[in-house]
Amino acid sequence: MKAVLTRVSSASVSVDDEIVGAIDCPDTGGILALVGVGAADSDDAWETMVRKIAELRILDGEQSVSDVNAPVLLVSQFTLHGRTAKGRRPSWSDAAPGEVAEPVIEKIAQGLRERGITVEQGRFGAMMKVTSVNEGPFTVLVEC
């Protein structure tokens, strides 16, 4: 499982020009989490990802999402598992198929909510437009 976590002051995701998820957090900051589920991920990788999103000290003042009750915008992104070593077209064979990935993304969202974290989401499998105001910029790649 891979995720790109970006510290933001606001972020939104739209489908067909309709906002389906948004966070606005100019005081605490928040996290835009682009998460890709891999075909070879372990059954409990989602739990590690929940801990990383909640507890990494990547917000202002070395605080975590849990420390300051910051919101998370969670967006599924299978393209994080694209392989580009050969040719001119990425291979997506390392990404989990949709029927496997979608419930894992839901487990991540639920796991964050169970920690009291506000979670907004994109729409799985949809063509989305993601807008964000990055802080820093501060972006990390998480693999688990």
UniProtKB/Swiss-Prot annotation:
The keyword Hydrolase applies. One of its GO terms (cellular component) is cytoplasm. An aminoacyl-tRNA editing enzyme that deacylates mischarged D-aminoacyl-tRNAs. Also deacylates mischarged glycyl-tRNA(Ala), protecting cells against glycine mischarging by AlaRS. Acts via tRNA-based rather than protein-based catalysis; rejects L-amino acids rather than detecting D-amino acids in the active site. By recycling D-aminoacyl-tRNA to D-amino acids and free tRNA molecules, this enzyme counteracts the toxicity associated with the formation of D-aminoacyl-tRNA entities in vivo and helps enforce protein L-homochirality. HAMAP family: Deacylase_Dtd. Keywords: Cytoplasm, Hydrolase, RNA-binding, tRNA-binding. InterPro entries: Daa-tRNA_deacyls_DTD (IPR003732), DTD-like_sf (IPR023509). Gene3D superfamilies: D-tyrosyl-tRNA(Tyr) deacylase. Belongs to the DTD family. It catalyses: glycyl-tRNA(Ala) + H2O = tRNA(Ala) + glycine + H(+); a D-aminoacyl-tRNA + H2O = a tRNA + a D-alpha-amino acid + H(+). It comes from the Bacteria. Homodimer. One of its GO terms (molecular function) is Gly-tRNA(Ala) deacylase activity. This is D-aminoacyl-tRNA deacylase. It is found in: Cytoplasm. It holds the Pfam family Tyr_Deacylase. GO terms for biological process: D-amino acid catabolic process. Its EC number is 3.1.1.96. Coiled coil: none annotated. A motif (Gly-cisPro motif, important for rejection of L-amino acids) lies at residues 136-137. A Gly-cisPro motif from one monomer fits into the active site of the other monomer to allow specific chiral rejection of L-amino acids.
